[in-house]
Amino acid sequence: MHNEAPITRRKSKRIYVGKVPVGDGAPIAVQSMTNTRTTDVAATVAQIKALERVGVDIVRVSVPTMDAAEAFRLIKQQVNVPLVADIHFDYRIALKVAEYGVDCLRINPGNIGNEERIRTVVDCARHYNIPIRIGVNGGSLEKDLQEKYGEPTPQALLESAMRHVDHLDRLNFDMFKVSVKASDVFLAVESYRLLAKQIDQPLHLGITEAGGARAGAVKSAIGLGLLLSEGIGDTLRISLAADPVEEVKVGFDILKSLRIRARGINFIACPTCSRQEFDVIGTVNALEERLEDIITPMDISIIGCVVNGPGEATVSTMGVTGGSKKSGFYEDGVRLRERLDNDNMIDQLEARIRAKATILDAARRIDIQQVEK
């Protein structure tokens, strides 16, 4: 029930990764990357399907060898989500996966080779109508830029990116997006800000090698949150040393928190104190797990007492305000006569939230049909 974010997005060109639109006002796409051995086709396919179930828009797959390229062909046949092939060092692998139907090529200018090899990759991408992501990384800058700047700086990352943007421009190829990732939040943020002023291509956001599940999520939320709040960014990936499924969840949580893109339930819950009338923490944890399959955007407030409960509930799709033995229940901002038993809170809320999701989905389908007419 909250309003959309007061964010004006940076204008950028439109490209497509498979059927997913990127840039020019398209929804910000959430990306992840497999961490299986690509040659283990079954494991990689299983992981991609797990990512699909939590709503991933694009999946990147590392293709380090020709054997991995052959495995990629089999993987591509078994999944629905667009796949980006991550290519380093051997440009010939890019040519092979392009033949096998890759949806996007990610190349690192610092290690893909000389200009002639880049030209060959670009000509191949043009032939198959495949976009490219120029992936600049603070940890793998070109040697001459390392010598020039001494260490990764925003200017160094910008110069690396612009060097290869200019190269693609000379080759008359404009189906590309760019990233300038770094593990340091300030370095990454400033690099993206500089790049956003220089080009109008879509930008892929990320804080590279951000860390484990908790620290990496925090670091990514700060860095990407700053950029997204300034309207910068068209796709994103949360790089975590964790299950890739968690990357997707954190990515959507960041977009949801900024009210940029809603998917699933936004739980509003108090941290609890001695005033709580029911187990708020247990209730929220259980509902988050039980309702992971719900993709309908909803704000659900779960507050343990009457201090802030009514205020939050009146601006939520559904809300609970803690009371003695039974708690107040709100729907669409209106308090209902019906109260919920504190001892059976989780089951009652799950049933009501699922029913509400069904109603909202049906209404949305009707709206879409009317627009199409």
From Swiss-Prot:
Residue positions binding [4Fe-4S] cluster: C270, C273, C305, E312
EC number(s) stated in the UniProt entry for this protein: 1.17.7.3
SUPFAM superfamilies in alphabetical order: Enolase C-terminal domain-like, Nitrite and sulphite reductase 4Fe-4S domain-like
Pathway this chain belongs to: Isoprenoid biosynthesis; isopentenyl diphosphate biosynthesis via DXP pathway; isopentenyl diphosphate from 1-deoxy-D-xylulose 5-phosphate: step 5/6
Cofactors that this protein relies on: [4Fe-4S] cluster
Catalytic activity entry: (2E)-4-hydroxy-3-methylbut-2-enyl diphosphate + oxidized [flavodoxin] + H2O + 2 H(+) = 2-C-methyl-D-erythritol 2,4-cyclic diphosphate + reduced [flavodoxin]
Free-text comment on the cofactor: Binds 1 [4Fe-4S] cluster.
InterPro entries membership: Dihydropteroate_synth-like_sf, Enolase-like_C_sf, IspG_bac, IspG_bac-typ, NO2/SO3_Rdtase_4Fe4S_sf
Single GO biological process annotation from the record: terpenoid biosynthetic process
GO molecular function: 4 iron, 4 sulfur cluster binding; 4-hydroxy-3-methylbut-2-en-1-yl diphosphate synthase activity (ferredoxin); 4-hydroxy-3-methylbut-2-enyl-diphosphate synthase activity (flavodoxin); iron ion binding
Keywords noted in UniProt: 4Fe-4S, Iron, Iron-sulfur, Isoprene biosynthesis, Metal-binding, Oxidoreductase
Pfam families per UniProt: GcpE
Family that this chain belongs to: Belongs to the IspG family.
General function of this protein: Converts 2C-methyl-D-erythritol 2,4-cyclodiphosphate (ME-2,4cPP) into 1-hydroxy-2-methyl-2-(E)-butenyl 4-diphosphate.
Protein name in the entry: 4-hydroxy-3-methylbut-2-en-1-yl diphosphate synthase (flavodoxin)
Organism: Erwinia tasmaniensis (strain DSM 17950 / CFBP 7177 / CIP 109463 / NCPPB 4357 / Et1/99)
